[in-house]
C-alpha cells in the first residue's frame, strides 16, 4: 500500500518503511508525527480525496534534522566589474514512514 501526502507545500509518494526528506518541521528527533493530509491511497483499492481522503493518516518518525547541499547563486554584470556571489543551504527533516492507515 502507498499514499500520496502533502507537507510543506509539496507532495510525496510514500510507502511503509520508506525515508523522505521534507521541509523543516518543528519536532524533536526521535519523536513521532501524524500526517493527516493524505491526497490519495493506492495499492489494491485506490481512494482519491477531494482534496483529502477522510480518516486516512500516515504515521512517521523524525529521524534527523539537517541542511541540504549548498546552492551557489552567482550574478555578473558585464563591462561593469560588478558581480555578486551568494550561497544557500535549505533546512530539512528526514522522516521514516511507520504506518499508513485508512
From Swiss-Prot:
Record's protein name: Large ribosomal subunit protein bL21
Alphabetized InterPro entries for the sequence: bL21-like, bL21-like_sf, Ribosomal_bL21
Role summary: This protein binds to 23S rRNA in the presence of protein L20.
One cellular component (GO) term of this entry: ribonucleoprotein complex
Tagged with keyword RNA-binding: yes
Keyword rRNA-binding on entry: yes
Pfam families associated with the record: Ribosomal_L21p (PF00829)
GO biological process: translation
HAMAP family associated with the record: Ribosomal_bL21
Gene Ontology MF annotations: rRNA binding; structural constituent of ribosome
Keywords tagged on the record: Ribonucleoprotein, Ribosomal protein, RNA-binding, rRNA-binding
Protein family (similarity comment): Belongs to the bacterial ribosomal protein bL21 family.
Subunit structure: Part of the 50S ribosomal subunit. Contacts protein L20.
Amino acid at each position: 500500500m502507498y499514499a500520496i501526502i502533502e507537507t510543506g507545500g509539496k507532495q510525496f509518494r510514500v510507502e511503509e518503511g520508506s525515508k523522505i526528506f521534507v521541509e523543516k518541521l518543528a519536532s524533536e528527533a526521535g519523536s513521532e508525527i501524524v500526517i493527516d493530509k493524505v491526497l490519495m491511497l493506492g495499492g489494491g483499492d485506490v481512494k482519491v480525496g477531494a482534496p483529502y481522503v477522510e480518516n486516512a493518516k500516515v504515521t512517521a518518525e523524525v529521524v534527523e534534522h539537517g541542511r541540504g547541499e549548498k546552492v551557489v547563486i552567482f550574478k555578473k554584470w558585464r563591462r561593469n566589474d560588478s558581480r555578486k556571489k551568494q550561497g544557500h543551504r535549505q533546512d530539512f527533516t528526514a522522516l521514516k514512514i511507520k504506518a499508513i492507515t485508512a
